[in-house]
């Protein structure tokens, strides 16, 4: 472990950051240093601005994704190295308020059926069946699956919140098959890392993302599909099936109901259940006027 990595790790742990956030922040700083092929303590705000432009123009990342990179870099330089920089030197990009991508239930089925491996199929099913975040998926442990109460325990989610999400009977059956397929039975992680999925560390967030992209390509789905899309689908399809917003808020782990209310804009059932005011007007049939 390098000196800088050790210092950053200790600072993150001292501030009680979650394991997922710690891994994420360290990876982002390492990627930044690799991009410039230079030790990060020799780089400055101008390099961060150049990197931000690279993430937008070359990597084609969204404003939200670029912001998470900047969060990690700000922590490293301002909190870890105590650089007297103003946050104005590295401003967050303005977010686009667009409605998220949604797949129909038929498209979700096509996506899952097109998974390139049984392991990828299980990842996609778990994301859609539970609505959990990609980072939460990668940190799942075997002991988090409660088949007696039919729930999945999410520990240390966003904001270090614990919560329970639903465990569908179909997903439980799939997870049991996944366990039987494993070459080396992990005693800890539900989805172990490395090539044979038998490592001592969990998969990283790239694995589910690659699973989504590969399955979408094989299924002929032209929409941009990534793990969070399946979370959006979970919430929208629940709403269309009659679930109330408050229940969905709890399952998603949202702090504010306003975050969950966006799915009202995506639900076809709610859109079609509301009549346009034009429909209530008593209009005459148009005919040309004689002069």
Predicted regions, residues:
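Conserved catalytic core of the tyrosine transesterase superfamily
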Residues: 1-291
């Amino acid at each position: 472990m390098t000196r800088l990595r050790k210092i950053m790790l200790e600072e993150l742990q001292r501030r009680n950051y979650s394991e997922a956030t710690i891994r994420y922040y360290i990876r982002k700083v390492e990627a930044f240093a690799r991009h410039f092929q230079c030790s990060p303590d020799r780089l400055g705000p101008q390099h961060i601005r150049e990197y931000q432009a690279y993430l937008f123009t070359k990597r084609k990342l969204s404003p939200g994704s670029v912001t998470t990179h900047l969060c990690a870099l700000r922590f490293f330089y301002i909190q870890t190295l105590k650089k007297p920089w103003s946050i104005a030197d590295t401003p967050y990009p303005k977010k686009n308020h667009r409605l998220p991508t949604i797949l129909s239930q038929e498209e979700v089925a096509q996506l899952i059926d097109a998974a390139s491996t049984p392991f990828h199929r299980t990842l996609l099913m778990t994301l859609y069946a539970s609505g959990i975040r990609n980072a939460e998926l990668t940190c799942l442990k075997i002991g988090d699956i409660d088949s007696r109460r039919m729930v999945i325990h999410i520990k240390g989610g966003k904001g270090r919140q614990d919560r329970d999400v639903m465990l569908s009977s179909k997903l439980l059956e799939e997870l049991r098959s996944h366990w039987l397929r494993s070459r080396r039975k992990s005693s800890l992680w539900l989805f172990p890392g490395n090539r044979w999925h038998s490592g001592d560390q969990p998969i990283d967030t790239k694995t589910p993302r690659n699973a989504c992209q590969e399955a979408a390509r094989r299924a002929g789905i032209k929409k941009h599909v990534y793990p969070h899309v399946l979370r959006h689908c979970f919430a929208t399809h629940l709403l269309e099936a009659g679930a109330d917003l408050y229940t969905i808020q709890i399952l998603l782990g949202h702090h504010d109901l306003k975050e969950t209310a966006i799915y009202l804009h995506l639900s076809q059932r709610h859109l079609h259940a509301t009549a346009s005011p034009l429909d209530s007007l008593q209009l005459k049939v148009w005919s040309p006027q004689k002069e």
